[in-house]
């Protein structure tokens, strides 16, 4: 009996050992994390597809899907095809929470990607307990500096330079270029605008006139007119506008109507010509001469290898749509997401993806003209901007005819001219 039991035990142990060896050689099982099968990865995004903030931003999911489809047609990511589920949050935080819950609980996505807006992203991150549940929130479309704080947001990764970084770079430019001028600022009075104010303060710039506005109020006819009345009364020779594109539209249109001239310096969020054109095409020429900031190559730059690739992919996927900054943003976001998924390997898990971005993200191939700042201690995305001037078509052209990039951090670090050289694009723009 003892010998028989020993033989059975030995046989059982051998079978278990073989089974373990076999299991270790197989791809990740579909049940390891929600949103994964052996052949698919399901991602989700909430974004304003309708509502006041939808013009321009509503193109981001389509741009992301265009790049994902291109990758899928070329073999996918480690044998898996990517699907993207998009939800309309109307730029309303409570709606963003509801839509994020749908993505997580009903659609069972593996990760969120590219959620848009500071207030919406903060709300959905807290309410759905992304951090506690270990759900990655990849490359959020907001520059609020808090999302780069790993301790506060351990599963969230920024992709845009922070608003504090942008404000510090803007401040350096304004102080050096418009010394002695009367300078005013219009800013959105929420975490978006206040993050910028912290950057301006860090850079040591003060404004003669501060004009805050509540998010959404820029669409009211009296709001823009009120801004211009205050600017005229202050004698502002230079006006910084740190708001969304609909705020830029209101400011530029009312300044034109009142025949008020000031040198406009527009933050990156508020300077998209296509978004302004969605309100009224006649407003686009009003951008002429304004200063703008970007960290990606201009969408009109046909000499850039990423722009050429993205234009080709988008023309096939969305032949009736205009290729613009929003498309570049969406496709760039998708590109970096694919790099991260590829680097995480075939045995993909949520925890493994987060660790991969922390360990390797700073070296990911990407379209941006600034370094990425991902590390084991910080979830910082791009780290700088180049400065340009809008022409009569609304295109932002680099000053001096070349991209001169300035980088900084969200603290008290200096603003410096960058010597960063972007790595060559992978073959065919596919993950490597």
Model-derived segments and their meaning:
Residues 33-65, 87-94, 116-117, 186-194, ...:
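Extracytoplasmic "Venus flytrap"
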Residues 255-331, 423-430:
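Extracellular/periplasmic periplasmic-binding protein-like sensory domains
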Residues 94-98, 145-146, 154-259, 300-308:
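Extracellular/periplasmic Venus flytrap/periplasmic-binding protein
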Residues 197-199, 245-250, 298-360:
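Extracellular/periplasmic ligand-binding modules, especially the Venus flytrap/periplasmic-binding
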Residues 362-432:
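Solvent-exposed, acidic/polar segments of extracytosolic/periplasmic ligand-binding ectodomains
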Residues 1-42, 420-432:
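Short, low-complexity disordered leader/linker segments with a strong preference
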Residues 31-32, 55-62, 74-150, 159, ...:
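Beta-alpha junction/loop-to-helix N-cap segments that form part of ligand/metal-binding clefts
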Residues 103-117, 135-140, 182-187, 235-245, ...:
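Periplasmic-binding protein-like
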């Amino acid at each position: 009996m003892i010998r028989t039991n020993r033989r059975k035990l030995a046989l059982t142990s051998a079978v278990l050992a073989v089974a373990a060896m076999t299991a270790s050689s197989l791809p990740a099982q579909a049940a390891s994390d929600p949103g994964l099968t052996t052949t698919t990865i399901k991602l989700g995004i909430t974004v304003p597809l309708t509502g006041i903030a939808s013009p321009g931003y509503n193109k981001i999911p389509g741009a992301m899907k265009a790049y994902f489809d291109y990758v899928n047609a070329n073999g996918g990511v480690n044998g898996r095809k990517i699907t993207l589920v998009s939800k309309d949050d109307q730029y309303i935080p409570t709606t963003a929470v509801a839509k994020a819950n749908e993505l997580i609980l009903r659609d069972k996505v593996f990760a969120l990607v590219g959620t848009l807006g500071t207030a919406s992203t903060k709300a959905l991150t807290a309410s759905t307990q992304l951090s506690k549940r270990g759900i990655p929130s990849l490359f959020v479309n907001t520059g609020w500096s808090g999302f780069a704080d790993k301790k506060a947001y351990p599963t969230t990764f920024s992709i845009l330079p922070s608003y504090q970084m942008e404000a510090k770079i803007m401040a350096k430019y304004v102080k050096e270029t418009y010394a002695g001028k009367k300078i005013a600022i219009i800013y959105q009075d929420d975490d978006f605008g206040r993050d910028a104010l912290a950057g301006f303060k860090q850079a040591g710039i003060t404004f003669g006139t501060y004009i805050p506005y509540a998010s959404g109020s820029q669409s009211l006819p009296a709001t823009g007119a009120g801004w211009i009345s205050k600017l005229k009364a202050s004698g502002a020779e230079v006006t910084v506008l740190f708001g969304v594109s609909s705020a830029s539209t209101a400011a530029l249109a009312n300044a034109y109507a009142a025949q008020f001239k000031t040198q406009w310096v527009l933050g990156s969020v508020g300077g998209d010509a296509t978004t302004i054109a969605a309100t009224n095409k006649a407003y686009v020429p009003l951008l002429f001469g304004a200063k703008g900031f970007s960290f990606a190559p201009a969408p009109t730059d046909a000499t850039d290898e990423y722009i050429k690739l993205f234009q080709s992919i988008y023309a096939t996927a969305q032949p009736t749509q205009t290729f613009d900054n929003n498309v570049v943003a969406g496709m760039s976001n998708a590109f970096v997401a694919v790099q991260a998924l590829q680097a995480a390997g075939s045995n993909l898990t949520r925890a493994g993806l987060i660790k991969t971005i922390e360990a390797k993200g700073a070296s990911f191939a990407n379209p941006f003209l600034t370094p990425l700042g991902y590390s084991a201690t910080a979830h910082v995305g791009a780290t700088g901007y180049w400065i340009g001037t809008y022409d009569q078509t609304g295109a932002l052209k680099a000053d001096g005819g070349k991209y001169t990039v300035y980088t900084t951090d969200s603290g008290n670090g200096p603003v410096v001219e960058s010597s960063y050289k972007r790595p060559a694009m992978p073959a065919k723009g596919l993950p490597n």
